[in-house]
Amino acid sequence: MMHTFLRRLCVVALCLGYIKASADFDCRRTSQSCVTGTCNDVNGDCDCPTDANGVATHRNADCGLEIAKVVPTALCGPPCLNGGECYEPTVGTYMCMCPEAFYGNKCENPRKKVECSGTEITINYMPIPTFSGDIFILDNRNTPECAFTEANGMYTATFTYQQCGVTTTNDQPNAGDTSYEISAAVRFNANIERATDMKLTAKCVIDGTGQSNLNDNIGTVSVDQRTDLTEETALTEYQPVSFQLQGKNGNPMPVPVNLGDELRIYIPLADTGRYTKLKITELQTNNGMVEQDLVMETLIFNGCLTDIGEALVTGDISSDPAIPAIIINFMAFRLRGSPQVKFDARVQVCEGTDTSCDSVVCPSPPQSVPSNPQNIPPANPQNIPPANPQNIPPANPQISPSSSQRKRRAAPDNEVILHETLTVLDPRSNEKLRLPHNKSDIKSQQNADPQQCLQSTEIMVMVIVLIVAVVLLLVITTCLAVKFMKQRAAQVKIYNPDMPTGNNTVRIPRAAC
Protein backbone atom coordinates (compact mmCIF):
# COMPACT_ATOMS: atom_id res chain seq x y z
CA MET A 1 0.00 0.00 0.00
CA MET A 2 2.81 2.41 0.87
CA HIS A 3 4.47 1.66 -2.45
CA THR A 4 1.24 2.46 -4.30
CA PHE A 5 0.85 5.70 -2.37
CA LEU A 6 4.38 6.80 -3.19
CA ARG A 7 3.77 6.04 -6.84
CA ARG A 8 0.72 8.30 -6.76
CA LEU A 9 2.44 11.18 -4.97
CA CYS A 10 3.96 13.90 -7.11
CA VAL A 11 5.42 17.27 -6.15
CA VAL A 12 6.50 19.39 -9.08
CA ALA A 13 7.74 22.96 -8.85
CA LEU A 14 6.62 25.41 -11.51
CA CYS A 15 9.44 26.34 -13.91
CA LEU A 16 8.95 29.84 -15.28
CA GLY A 17 11.69 31.28 -17.46
CA TYR A 18 12.69 34.85 -16.82
CA ILE A 19 10.81 37.27 -19.02
CA LYS A 20 11.02 40.97 -18.26
CA ALA A 21 7.81 42.37 -16.80
CA SER A 22 6.26 38.93 -16.66
CA ALA A 23 3.09 38.09 -14.80
CA ASP A 24 4.76 37.97 -11.38
CA PHE A 25 5.74 41.64 -11.55
CA ASP A 26 3.76 44.63 -12.77
CA CYS A 27 4.74 48.09 -11.56
CA ARG A 28 1.10 49.23 -11.76
CA ARG A 29 0.19 46.92 -8.89
CA THR A 30 0.00 47.94 -5.26
CA SER A 31 3.26 47.05 -3.46
CA GLN A 32 5.14 46.47 -6.72
CA SER A 33 7.13 49.46 -7.91
CA CYS A 34 10.29 50.22 -9.84
CA VAL A 35 13.44 50.46 -7.69
CA THR A 36 14.92 52.82 -10.27
CA GLY A 37 13.58 54.22 -13.52
CA THR A 38 9.93 54.89 -14.25
CA CYS A 39 6.81 52.75 -14.54
CA ASN A 40 5.16 52.33 -17.93
CA ASP A 41 1.45 52.75 -17.23
CA VAL A 42 0.54 50.99 -20.47
CA ASN A 43 2.17 47.59 -19.97
CA GLY A 44 3.48 47.61 -16.40
CA ASP A 45 7.14 47.46 -17.40
CA CYS A 46 9.85 49.41 -15.62
CA ASP A 47 11.82 51.64 -17.96
CA CYS A 48 15.33 51.41 -16.53
CA PRO A 49 17.64 54.45 -16.39
CA THR A 50 20.53 54.98 -18.80
CA ASP A 51 23.82 56.86 -18.63
CA ALA A 52 24.85 59.86 -20.72
CA ASN A 53 25.57 57.59 -23.67
CA GLY A 54 22.14 55.98 -23.55
CA VAL A 55 23.43 52.69 -22.14
CA ALA A 56 21.26 51.04 -19.49
CA THR A 57 22.69 51.22 -15.98
CA HIS A 58 20.16 48.89 -14.37
CA ARG A 59 18.11 45.87 -15.36
CA ASN A 60 15.75 43.22 -13.94
CA ALA A 61 11.98 43.52 -13.85
CA ASP A 62 12.02 46.30 -11.24
CA CYS A 63 15.28 47.85 -12.55
CA GLY A 64 16.79 46.95 -9.18
CA LEU A 65 19.98 45.30 -10.45
CA GLU A 66 22.84 47.74 -10.98
CA ILE A 67 24.72 46.36 -13.96
CA ALA A 68 28.07 47.67 -12.70
CA LYS A 69 27.75 45.42 -9.64
CA VAL A 70 27.16 42.20 -11.57
CA VAL A 71 30.10 39.84 -10.97
CA PRO A 72 31.11 36.40 -12.27
CA THR A 73 28.83 33.57 -11.15
CA ALA A 74 31.71 31.74 -9.45
CA LEU A 75 31.91 34.41 -6.75
CA CYS A 76 28.50 33.35 -5.43
CA GLY A 77 29.82 29.87 -4.58
CA PRO A 78 27.21 27.45 -5.88
CA PRO A 79 25.87 29.21 -8.98
CA CYS A 80 22.64 31.15 -9.00
CA LEU A 81 19.80 29.07 -10.44
CA ASN A 82 16.87 29.79 -12.74
CA GLY A 83 18.44 32.79 -14.44
CA GLY A 84 19.60 34.50 -11.24
CA GLU A 85 22.65 36.77 -11.45
CA CYS A 86 25.52 37.11 -8.99
CA TYR A 87 26.13 40.68 -7.84
CA GLU A 88 28.10 42.56 -5.20
CA PRO A 89 25.82 44.96 -3.26
CA THR A 90 28.69 45.93 -0.94
CA VAL A 91 32.40 45.27 -1.19
CA GLY A 92 33.11 41.61 -0.50
CA THR A 93 29.43 40.61 -0.22
CA TYR A 94 28.03 38.44 -2.99
CA MET A 95 24.36 37.58 -3.50
CA CYS A 96 22.03 36.20 -6.15
CA MET A 97 19.57 38.61 -7.75
CA CYS A 98 16.62 36.45 -8.78
CA PRO A 99 14.19 36.89 -11.65
CA GLU A 100 10.72 37.77 -10.44
CA ALA A 101 9.39 34.20 -10.81
CA PHE A 102 11.87 32.78 -8.25
CA TYR A 103 13.24 33.50 -4.78
CA GLY A 104 15.74 32.07 -2.30
CA ASN A 105 19.46 32.44 -1.64
CA LYS A 106 20.22 30.74 -4.95
CA CYS A 107 16.90 31.49 -6.68
CA GLU A 108 16.06 27.83 -6.18
CA ASN A 109 12.40 28.28 -5.18
CA PRO A 110 9.59 29.03 -7.64
CA ARG A 111 7.00 31.51 -6.43
CA LYS A 112 4.24 29.19 -7.68
CA LYS A 113 4.29 25.55 -6.66
CA VAL A 114 1.66 22.83 -6.84
CA GLU A 115 1.64 19.53 -4.93
CA CYS A 116 -0.58 16.65 -6.05
CA SER A 117 -1.41 13.36 -4.38
CA GLY A 118 -3.98 10.72 -5.07
CA THR A 119 -6.63 12.55 -3.02
CA GLU A 120 -5.81 16.25 -2.70
CA ILE A 121 -4.11 19.28 -4.20
CA THR A 122 -2.01 21.98 -2.54
CA ILE A 123 -1.35 25.41 -4.08
CA ASN A 124 1.59 27.46 -2.77
CA TYR A 125 2.23 31.06 -3.79
CA MET A 126 4.97 33.37 -2.54
CA PRO A 127 4.14 36.94 -3.65
CA ILE A 128 6.82 39.52 -4.26
CA PRO A 129 7.25 41.57 -1.05
CA THR A 130 5.54 43.56 0.21
CA PHE A 131 2.17 41.96 -0.56
CA SER A 132 -0.93 43.34 1.17
CA GLY A 133 -3.68 41.95 -1.02
CA ASP A 134 -5.92 38.90 -1.02
CA ILE A 135 -5.69 35.37 -2.48
CA PHE A 136 -8.74 33.14 -2.81
CA ILE A 137 -10.17 30.27 -4.85
CA LEU A 138 -12.46 31.61 -7.55
CA ASP A 139 -16.16 31.41 -6.63
CA ASN A 140 -15.19 30.20 -3.12
CA ARG A 141 -13.84 33.34 -1.49
CA ASN A 142 -15.81 32.88 1.73
CA THR A 143 -15.62 29.07 1.94
CA PRO A 144 -13.51 28.16 5.02
CA GLU A 145 -12.13 24.87 3.69
CA CYS A 146 -10.91 26.65 0.54
CA ALA A 147 -9.14 29.52 2.29
CA PHE A 148 -5.44 30.30 1.91
CA THR A 149 -3.31 30.56 5.03
CA GLU A 150 -0.18 32.70 5.30
CA ALA A 151 3.09 31.77 6.99
CA ASN A 152 6.33 33.71 6.52
CA GLY A 153 5.00 35.28 3.34
CA MET A 154 3.91 31.95 1.78
CA TYR A 155 0.20 31.53 0.99
CA THR A 156 -1.03 27.91 0.98
CA ALA A 157 -4.37 26.20 0.34
CA THR A 158 -5.00 22.44 0.52
CA PHE A 159 -8.24 20.67 -0.37
CA THR A 160 -9.48 17.44 -1.87
CA TYR A 161 -10.42 16.93 -5.48
CA GLN A 162 -14.08 16.96 -4.42
CA GLN A 163 -13.93 20.42 -2.77
CA CYS A 164 -13.82 24.06 -3.82
CA GLY A 165 -15.14 23.54 -7.34
CA VAL A 166 -12.27 21.42 -8.61
CA THR A 167 -13.03 20.44 -12.21
CA THR A 168 -12.62 16.74 -12.94
CA THR A 169 -12.02 15.49 -16.49
CA ASN A 170 -11.75 11.80 -17.25
CA ASP A 171 -9.59 10.29 -20.00
CA GLN A 172 -7.53 13.45 -20.31
CA PRO A 173 -4.88 13.89 -21.54
CA ASN A 174 -4.82 10.16 -22.31
CA ALA A 175 -7.31 7.32 -21.99
CA GLY A 176 -7.52 6.17 -18.37
CA ASP A 177 -6.07 9.43 -16.99
CA THR A 178 -7.95 11.80 -14.70
CA SER A 179 -7.30 15.55 -14.73
CA TYR A 180 -8.16 17.94 -11.88
CA GLU A 181 -8.12 21.71 -12.38
CA ILE A 182 -8.65 24.63 -9.99
CA SER A 183 -8.15 28.39 -10.28
CA ALA A 184 -7.27 31.04 -7.72
CA ALA A 185 -7.35 34.84 -7.89
CA VAL A 186 -4.56 37.06 -6.61
CA ARG A 187 -5.86 40.53 -5.85
CA PHE A 188 -3.05 42.97 -5.08
CA ASN A 189 -5.40 45.36 -3.33
CA ALA A 190 -7.89 43.59 -1.07
CA ASN A 191 -10.59 46.17 -1.79
CA ILE A 192 -10.04 46.89 -5.47
CA GLU A 193 -10.26 44.53 -8.44
CA ARG A 194 -8.09 45.60 -11.36
CA ALA A 195 -6.99 44.30 -14.73
CA THR A 196 -3.51 43.78 -13.29
CA ASP A 197 -4.76 41.13 -10.85
CA MET A 198 -3.73 37.54 -11.51
CA LYS A 199 -5.44 34.23 -12.06
CA LEU A 200 -3.52 31.07 -11.14
CA THR A 201 -4.70 27.80 -12.67
CA ALA A 202 -3.24 24.52 -11.35
CA LYS A 203 -3.84 21.19 -13.03
CA CYS A 204 -3.06 17.74 -11.60
CA VAL A 205 -3.06 14.65 -13.79
CA ILE A 206 -3.37 11.18 -12.28
CA ASP A 207 -1.92 8.67 -14.70
CA GLY A 208 -4.24 5.79 -15.54
CA THR A 209 -1.38 3.34 -14.95
CA GLY A 210 -1.39 4.13 -11.24
CA GLN A 211 1.50 6.58 -11.42
CA SER A 212 0.98 10.27 -10.86
CA ASN A 213 2.47 13.27 -12.56
CA LEU A 214 1.64 16.94 -12.64
CA ASN A 215 1.21 19.26 -15.57
CA ASP A 216 0.58 22.53 -13.82
CA ASN A 217 -0.60 25.42 -15.93
CA ILE A 218 -0.14 28.48 -13.80
CA GLY A 219 -0.67 31.50 -15.95
CA THR A 220 -1.92 35.01 -15.51
CA VAL A 221 -4.94 36.81 -16.88
CA SER A 222 -7.06 39.65 -15.70
CA VAL A 223 -9.42 38.38 -13.01
CA ASP A 224 -12.21 40.66 -14.16
CA GLN A 225 -11.78 39.44 -17.75
CA ARG A 226 -11.01 35.81 -17.07
CA THR A 227 -13.78 34.59 -19.38
CA ASP A 228 -12.41 36.59 -22.32
CA LEU A 229 -8.66 36.12 -22.23
CA THR A 230 -6.34 33.24 -22.98
CA GLU A 231 -4.08 32.28 -20.15
CA GLU A 232 -0.36 32.76 -20.50
CA THR A 233 0.70 29.26 -19.56
CA ALA A 234 3.89 28.27 -17.79
CA LEU A 235 4.71 24.63 -18.44
CA THR A 236 6.77 22.30 -16.31
CA GLU A 237 9.12 21.87 -19.27
CA TYR A 238 11.80 24.52 -19.69
CA GLN A 239 11.09 26.92 -22.55
CA PRO A 240 14.21 28.80 -23.60
CA VAL A 241 12.37 31.25 -25.90
CA SER A 242 8.88 32.62 -26.47
CA PHE A 243 7.02 34.16 -29.42
CA GLN A 244 5.27 37.49 -28.88
CA LEU A 245 3.30 39.69 -31.25
CA GLN A 246 3.54 43.34 -30.21
CA GLY A 247 2.71 46.79 -31.43
CA LYS A 248 5.32 49.20 -32.70
CA ASN A 249 8.29 49.71 -30.33
CA GLY A 250 7.06 46.89 -28.10
CA ASN A 251 3.75 48.53 -27.20
CA PRO A 252 0.67 46.35 -26.67
CA MET A 253 -0.79 45.14 -29.94
CA PRO A 254 -3.74 47.27 -31.16
CA VAL A 255 -7.22 45.75 -31.03
CA PRO A 256 -8.49 45.17 -33.59
CA VAL A 257 -5.50 44.89 -35.91
CA ASN A 258 -6.09 46.51 -39.31
CA LEU A 259 -4.15 46.18 -42.52
CA GLY A 260 -1.12 48.44 -42.43
CA ASP A 261 -0.79 48.65 -38.64
CA GLU A 262 2.83 48.72 -37.52
CA LEU A 263 3.61 45.55 -35.55
CA ARG A 264 6.62 43.50 -34.56
CA ILE A 265 7.55 39.91 -33.75
CA TYR A 266 9.50 39.73 -30.50
CA ILE A 267 11.32 36.48 -29.65
CA PRO A 268 13.24 36.85 -26.36
CA LEU A 269 15.59 34.39 -24.70
CA ALA A 270 14.05 33.41 -21.37
CA ASP A 271 17.31 33.62 -19.44
CA THR A 272 21.04 33.21 -19.93
CA GLY A 273 21.50 30.38 -17.46
CA ARG A 274 22.23 27.85 -20.20
CA TYR A 275 21.81 29.55 -23.56
CA THR A 276 23.26 32.98 -24.31
CA LYS A 277 22.46 33.48 -28.01
CA LEU A 278 19.63 32.78 -30.41
CA LYS A 279 18.94 33.00 -34.13
CA ILE A 280 15.77 32.63 -36.16
CA THR A 281 16.44 30.21 -39.00
CA GLU A 282 12.99 29.99 -40.59
CA LEU A 283 9.72 31.91 -40.46
CA GLN A 284 6.63 30.87 -42.37
CA THR A 285 3.13 32.28 -42.48
CA ASN A 286 -0.16 30.76 -43.63
CA ASN A 287 -3.83 31.68 -43.76
CA GLY A 288 -5.01 28.99 -41.34
CA MET A 289 -6.96 27.13 -44.01
CA VAL A 290 -6.62 23.48 -45.05
CA GLU A 291 -6.07 21.48 -48.22
CA GLN A 292 -6.62 23.46 -51.44
CA ASP A 293 -7.52 26.64 -49.51
CA LEU A 294 -4.19 26.73 -47.68
CA VAL A 295 -1.91 29.63 -48.65
CA MET A 296 1.62 29.57 -47.23
CA GLU A 297 4.62 31.86 -47.67
CA THR A 298 8.19 31.72 -46.35
CA LEU A 299 9.52 35.00 -44.96
CA ILE A 300 12.86 33.80 -43.55
CA PHE A 301 14.94 30.87 -44.80
CA ASN A 302 18.36 29.82 -43.49
CA GLY A 303 18.42 32.94 -41.32
CA CYS A 304 17.89 35.35 -44.25
CA LEU A 305 14.88 37.25 -45.57
CA THR A 306 13.37 35.81 -48.73
CA ASP A 307 12.02 37.93 -51.55
CA ILE A 308 8.56 37.75 -49.96
CA GLY A 309 10.09 38.55 -46.58
CA GLU A 310 11.81 41.63 -48.00
CA ALA A 311 8.43 42.89 -49.21
CA LEU A 312 6.61 42.30 -45.92
CA VAL A 313 9.28 42.98 -43.28
CA THR A 314 10.18 46.56 -42.42
CA GLY A 315 13.96 46.85 -42.40
CA ASP A 316 16.23 43.95 -41.48
CA ILE A 317 16.04 41.29 -38.80
CA SER A 318 17.27 43.10 -35.69
CA SER A 319 18.17 42.03 -32.19
CA ASP A 320 18.24 43.28 -28.62
CA PRO A 321 21.51 42.02 -27.13
CA ALA A 322 20.55 43.10 -23.61
CA ILE A 323 17.79 40.48 -23.32
CA PRO A 324 18.85 38.95 -25.84
CA ALA A 325 15.95 38.90 -28.30
CA ILE A 326 15.08 38.83 -32.00
CA ILE A 327 12.96 41.69 -33.38
CA ILE A 328 11.15 41.59 -36.73
CA ASN A 329 9.16 44.71 -37.65
CA PHE A 330 6.37 44.48 -40.21
CA MET A 331 3.14 46.12 -41.31
CA ALA A 332 0.01 44.04 -40.75
CA PHE A 333 -0.88 41.90 -43.74
CA ARG A 334 -2.92 38.83 -44.46
CA LEU A 335 -3.00 36.06 -47.03
CA ARG A 336 -5.69 35.24 -49.54
CA GLY A 337 -8.86 33.61 -48.28
CA SER A 338 -8.76 34.39 -44.55
CA PRO A 339 -8.29 37.24 -42.06
CA GLN A 340 -6.10 34.95 -39.98
CA VAL A 341 -2.32 35.09 -40.25
CA LYS A 342 -0.50 32.19 -38.59
CA PHE A 343 3.23 32.29 -37.95
CA ASP A 344 5.48 29.24 -37.60
CA ALA A 345 9.04 30.02 -36.48
CA ARG A 346 12.09 27.82 -36.08
CA VAL A 347 14.57 29.33 -33.61
CA GLN A 348 18.04 28.06 -32.74
CA VAL A 349 19.52 28.66 -29.27
CA CYS A 350 23.22 28.42 -28.52
CA GLU A 351 25.55 28.26 -25.56
CA GLY A 352 28.39 30.72 -25.18
CA THR A 353 31.01 28.90 -27.27
CA ASP A 354 28.62 27.75 -29.99
CA THR A 355 29.05 29.80 -33.18
CA SER A 356 26.03 28.39 -35.04
CA CYS A 357 23.90 31.31 -33.81
CA ASP A 358 26.27 33.90 -35.29
CA SER A 359 24.95 36.09 -38.09
CA VAL A 360 25.21 34.84 -41.67
CA VAL A 361 25.92 36.61 -44.95
CA CYS A 362 22.66 36.74 -46.88
CA PRO A 363 22.46 36.59 -50.68
CA SER A 364 21.62 39.64 -52.74
CA PRO A 365 19.04 39.82 -54.19
CA PRO A 366 17.01 37.83 -51.62
CA GLN A 367 16.38 34.20 -52.42
CA SER A 368 13.06 32.78 -53.54
CA VAL A 369 12.15 29.54 -51.78
CA PRO A 370 9.24 27.09 -52.04
CA SER A 371 6.56 26.95 -49.39
CA ASN A 372 7.36 24.91 -46.26
CA PRO A 373 10.95 24.03 -47.34
CA GLN A 374 11.87 22.24 -44.11
CA ASN A 375 8.36 21.01 -43.32
CA ILE A 376 7.83 23.15 -40.25
CA PRO A 377 4.67 21.66 -38.68
CA PRO A 378 2.04 24.41 -38.80
CA ALA A 379 -0.27 25.16 -35.93
CA ASN A 380 -3.57 23.28 -35.90
CA PRO A 381 -5.75 25.24 -38.42
CA GLN A 382 -8.91 24.66 -36.40
CA ASN A 383 -7.46 25.00 -32.92
CA ILE A 384 -4.81 27.57 -32.08
CA PRO A 385 -2.23 25.81 -29.89
CA PRO A 386 0.01 27.48 -27.35
CA ALA A 387 3.66 27.83 -28.20
CA ASN A 388 5.33 24.60 -27.14
CA PRO A 389 9.03 24.61 -27.96
CA GLN A 390 9.66 21.04 -26.88
CA ASN A 391 6.53 19.38 -28.24
CA ILE A 392 5.22 20.17 -31.71
CA PRO A 393 1.41 20.36 -31.40
CA PRO A 394 -0.35 17.52 -33.23
CA ALA A 395 -2.59 18.38 -36.16
CA ASN A 396 -5.21 15.97 -34.85
CA PRO A 397 -6.32 16.93 -31.31
CA GLN A 398 -7.18 13.29 -30.63
CA ILE A 399 -3.61 12.14 -31.21
CA SER A 400 -1.36 12.43 -28.19
CA PRO A 401 1.78 14.60 -28.54
CA SER A 402 4.05 11.59 -28.14
CA SER A 403 2.50 9.72 -31.04
CA SER A 404 2.50 12.85 -33.18
CA GLN A 405 6.19 13.37 -32.63
CA ARG A 406 6.98 9.95 -34.02
CA LYS A 407 5.42 10.99 -37.33
CA ARG A 408 7.21 14.33 -37.70
CA ARG A 409 10.78 15.39 -37.95
CA ALA A 410 11.75 16.31 -34.41
CA ALA A 411 13.59 19.54 -33.74
CA PRO A 412 17.19 19.23 -32.50
CA ASP A 413 17.88 19.80 -28.82
CA ASN A 414 19.03 23.37 -29.45
CA GLU A 415 16.14 24.25 -31.76
CA VAL A 416 12.59 25.21 -30.85
CA ILE A 417 9.46 25.61 -32.96
CA LEU A 418 7.02 28.38 -32.04
CA HIS A 419 3.52 29.23 -33.27
CA GLU A 420 1.42 32.39 -33.01
CA THR A 421 -1.78 33.62 -34.65
CA LEU A 422 -2.99 37.08 -35.63
CA THR A 423 -6.35 38.24 -37.02
CA VAL A 424 -6.15 41.20 -39.41
CA LEU A 425 -9.19 43.20 -40.59
CA ASP A 426 -9.55 45.37 -43.68
CA PRO A 427 -10.93 48.77 -42.55
CA ARG A 428 -12.01 49.54 -46.11
CA SER A 429 -14.64 46.81 -46.07
CA ASN A 430 -17.56 46.17 -43.75
CA GLU A 431 -16.33 42.74 -42.76
CA LYS A 432 -16.90 41.10 -39.41
CA LEU A 433 -14.38 39.34 -37.22
CA ARG A 434 -14.79 35.67 -38.13
CA LEU A 435 -12.48 32.71 -37.88
CA PRO A 436 -12.16 30.25 -40.76
CA HIS A 437 -14.24 27.14 -40.24
CA ASN A 438 -15.30 23.92 -41.82
CA LYS A 439 -18.76 23.43 -43.25
CA SER A 440 -19.65 21.36 -40.22
CA ASP A 441 -19.01 24.39 -38.00
CA ILE A 442 -21.32 26.81 -39.86
CA LYS A 443 -24.50 25.89 -38.00
CA SER A 444 -22.95 26.09 -34.54
CA GLN A 445 -21.28 29.43 -35.31
CA GLN A 446 -24.53 30.90 -36.57
CA ASN A 447 -26.26 29.85 -33.37
CA ALA A 448 -23.51 31.41 -31.29
CA ASP A 449 -23.21 34.69 -33.24
CA PRO A 450 -25.45 37.42 -31.75
CA GLN A 451 -25.25 39.39 -35.00
CA GLN A 452 -27.30 36.69 -36.71
CA CYS A 453 -30.09 37.27 -34.22
CA LEU A 454 -30.04 41.05 -34.58
CA GLN A 455 -30.16 40.80 -38.36
CA SER A 456 -33.21 38.53 -38.41
CA THR A 457 -35.87 39.92 -40.80
CA GLU A 458 -38.77 39.12 -38.49
CA ILE A 459 -37.21 40.91 -35.54
CA MET A 460 -36.33 43.96 -37.62
CA VAL A 461 -39.93 44.20 -38.90
CA MET A 462 -41.27 43.91 -35.35
CA VAL A 463 -38.94 46.65 -34.15
CA ILE A 464 -40.05 48.97 -36.97
CA VAL A 465 -43.74 48.33 -36.19
CA LEU A 466 -43.20 49.11 -32.52
CA ILE A 467 -41.36 52.33 -33.36
CA VAL A 468 -44.18 53.48 -35.67
CA ALA A 469 -46.78 52.66 -32.99
CA VAL A 470 -44.91 54.67 -30.37
CA VAL A 471 -44.60 57.67 -32.72
CA LEU A 472 -48.34 57.58 -33.54
CA LEU A 473 -49.19 57.38 -29.85
CA LEU A 474 -47.04 60.43 -29.14
CA VAL A 475 -48.72 62.39 -31.97
CA ILE A 476 -52.24 61.53 -30.76
CA THR A 477 -51.36 62.42 -27.17
CA THR A 478 -49.92 65.77 -28.27
CA CYS A 479 -53.04 66.63 -30.33
CA LEU A 480 -55.37 65.84 -27.42
CA ALA A 481 -53.31 67.96 -25.07
CA VAL A 482 -53.34 70.94 -27.46
CA LYS A 483 -57.11 70.65 -27.98
CA PHE A 484 -57.72 70.57 -24.23
CA MET A 485 -55.59 73.67 -23.65
CA LYS A 486 -57.46 75.60 -26.36
CA GLN A 487 -60.83 74.73 -24.80
CA ARG A 488 -59.66 75.96 -21.41
CA ALA A 489 -58.40 79.21 -22.91
CA ALA A 490 -61.79 79.86 -24.57
CA GLN A 491 -63.57 80.00 -21.24
CA VAL A 492 -63.74 83.34 -19.28
CA LYS A 493 -64.96 83.33 -15.73
CA ILE A 494 -67.04 86.42 -14.67
CA TYR A 495 -67.92 86.82 -11.03
CA ASN A 496 -71.10 88.92 -10.16
CA PRO A 497 -71.64 89.42 -6.40
CA ASP A 498 -75.28 90.58 -6.96
CA MET A 499 -76.25 87.23 -8.30
CA PRO A 500 -77.42 85.19 -5.32
CA THR A 501 -76.97 81.79 -6.80
CA GLY A 502 -76.34 80.01 -9.98
CA ASN A 503 -73.47 79.58 -12.33
CA ASN A 504 -71.26 82.63 -12.44
CA THR A 505 -69.37 81.41 -15.46
CA VAL A 506 -70.40 83.08 -18.70
CA ARG A 507 -69.29 81.68 -22.06
CA ILE A 508 -68.52 84.43 -24.56
CA PRO A 509 -69.41 83.43 -28.08
CA ARG A 510 -66.51 83.44 -30.48
CA ALA A 511 -66.67 84.77 -33.98
CA ALA A 512 -66.91 82.16 -36.63
CA CYS A 513 -63.79 81.65 -38.71
UniProtKB/Swiss-Prot annotation:
This is EGF-like domain-containing protein 1. Residues 1-21 form the signal peptide. One of its GO terms (cellular component) is extracellular region. The keyword Magnesium does not apply. Residues 375-396 have a biased composition (Pro residues). Residues 72-108 form the EGF-like domain. Coiled coil: none annotated. The keyword Zinc does not apply. Residues 356-411 are annotated as: Disordered. PROSITE patterns: EGF_1, EGF_3, ZP_2. Keywords: Disulfide bond, EGF-like domain, Glycoprotein, Secreted, Signal. Component of the acid-insoluble organic matrix of calcified layers of the shell (at protein level). It is found in: Secreted. Residues 115-364 form the ZP domain. Disulfide bonds join 76-86, 80-96, 98-107. Glycans are attached at residues 438, 503.
